Curated annotation (Swiss-Prot):
Family: Belongs to the universal ribosomal protein uS11 family.
Family annotation (InterPro entries): Ribosomal_uS11, Ribosomal_uS11_bac-type, Ribosomal_uS11_CS, Ribosomal_uS11_sf
Upper classification of the organism: Bacteria, Bacillati, Cyanobacteriota, Cyanophyceae, Synechococcales
Lineage: superkingdom: Bacteria
Cited PROSITE patterns: RIBOSOMAL_S11
Gene name per UniProt: rpsK
Protein's name according to its UniProt entry: Small ribosomal subunit protein uS11
Amino acid sequence: MARQQRRGRKVKKNVPNGVAYIQSTFNNTIVTITDPNGDVVSWASAGSTGFKGAKKGTPFAAQMAAESAARQAMENGMRQIEVMVSGPGAGRETAIRALQATGLEITLIRDITPIPHNGCRPPKRRRV
């Protein structure tokens, strides 16, 4: 039987600037903060911060997720970030404001939402 190797503690990186990716859907918001090479420094989602079900899609849940990810990134020495926002969700602006409120300096905001050139058929309208 193969012996399990012991993993060492996670090494703290000293990363002064990075990129924050905010993926905001109707059901959840995921905030990932990377270094300039694209290696993940910290991440958080509305679900990982304790929200369940329909509450994950709210702007407040996005704010909490952004604050959590930003706090972890600042522990690794991050000061400046570029923000890439993707998706149509409710938590887009709130997540950006939360990143700014934690003390990170935002140098750039870019919308990278993929727009189809008439690709897949969208879901039908809800009738309640």
